[in-house]
Amino acid sequence: MTDPNPEEPSAAAPSPSEPQRAHVHISGRVQGVYYRSAATEQARVLGLRGVVRNLPSGEVELIAEGPLAALQQLIAWCRLGPPAARVDKVAVRFDPATDEFPDFRVLRSVAPLLPPPGSSSDYEA
């Protein structure tokens, strides 16, 4: 399968037929601009489940599960963000879905759920 977006990972392209998990780190001016709230709204409209939160580094971490097409739409939105945001970088890693999330919600800002981009070669910018 050829990935239409060259910025997305292609070596480990997820299967379009099975639910996937996208683990996304967004950097730039993404805190204090309603990024999490807007991302939650987008994810819910797309029928995705997961979480989003601010990180101490100034990034936003988002984990979403669902159909690949819906995840790709959410990632495209993440590259733009809400009007007041300035997105500099979006790093994405795909994994199989775990079905651990009952819905999509904002979590309190604490330590990241997984290592940040740059600490693992599994992330693609």
Q: Residues of each region from the PLM?
A:
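Intrinsically disordered, low-complexity, mixed-charge
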Residues: T2-A125
